[in-house]
Amino acid sequence: SSDSVVVHTYSASCMEKIMTVKENKVLKFDKATMQPFLEKMFTGFFAVIDSEEFGENEYVMKATMRALSVVKEDVVAITELVLNKLTGALGRVCKNPKNPQYNHYLFESIAVLVRSVCSSQPSATTAFESLLFPPFQTILQMEVTEFIPYVFQVLAQLLEFKVDEIGTSYSTIFVPLLTPTLWESKGNVPALTRLLIAYMNKLGPAHPLITPNLMGILGVFQKRLSSKANEIFAFSLIGSILSHPDGYSAVEA
């Protein structure tokens, strides 16, 4: 509630460090300890994050990420509040990305929230998708290059947890994921590979979305295999195909 950015910064930095302290390899401030303070803590963080006056404070966003990492699934009770605030912040930074550290912790906060909530409640992916897809589509359409790897990372997470049909949003972006220019950026390769594997694990090579594009996927595999730095991603990708009962026949065809 202070009007001082310096107070915000040092308070957030202190809290973030406190949340990493361990005793006998166990967090001294675990999720049970944090539970009574969750709503008040996040309300304080987001009062700063929402404010145009205070700017993008990476220390506050890092503390937000750390708190989400510590409380894990206990954040479920205030998921709507946290997700709305994070997507609001995402919408603002998309217009003018200027603080890489802040942006990194923002996306990591979203990723931690997805993992914490959807690992215990897979059906929650629908709520996440409804709020995250609009800014994600904006990022991809506007080619905000510094954000694209993060978008692919979170999309892969959501798809991994998803229990129902993938829907048109995932179907629409699948073919563009095979575009060679996307794979030319080294920063995109790990997240893109994870996302393609998520599709393969979810649908299988015989799925109507996958089968017509299998040659494109194999092209991605061959290109990654030609690079020593990327061959691990190539083997992960081909492994996701061959792990299916119809994987070998699909590749041979």
Label for each model-derived stretch:
Residues S1-A253:
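Karyopherin-beta/Importin-beta family HEAT-repeat alpha-solenoid scaffold
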